[in-house]
Amino acid sequence: MASPSWYVIEHPFTRPVVSNPYPSSSFALDAADKVHGERLRRVRVADNEVWIGGIIVCSRKKAMAYKFKIKDWEGRYYA
């Protein structure tokens, strides 16, 4: 079974910018904190989805459900 991929999505409602995949949620959460420059309050919206100050940290399955254009580990876009 492949390891789950996690993504950091900035500006989800206007111009979504999706990061490269992270191997675990902890790496993705740390990356989202670095975008803001400080640790902000985390709001768990649903399974595999956390909002941090207007940034979404979610799994590949959630990102595909929201129809964001995401990349795999080789840099190819998922269909």
Where is each model-derived feature located?
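A short beta-strand micro-motif
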Residues: 4-13
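A generic structural signal for short, non-catalytic loop/turn and secondary-structure boundary residues
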Residues: 1-2, 50
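The identity of the second residue at the extreme N-terminus of proteins
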Residues: 2-3, 65
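Conserved aromatic
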Residues: 22-26, 57-58
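Short, mixed-charge low-complexity intrinsically disordered segments
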Residues: 17, 30-79
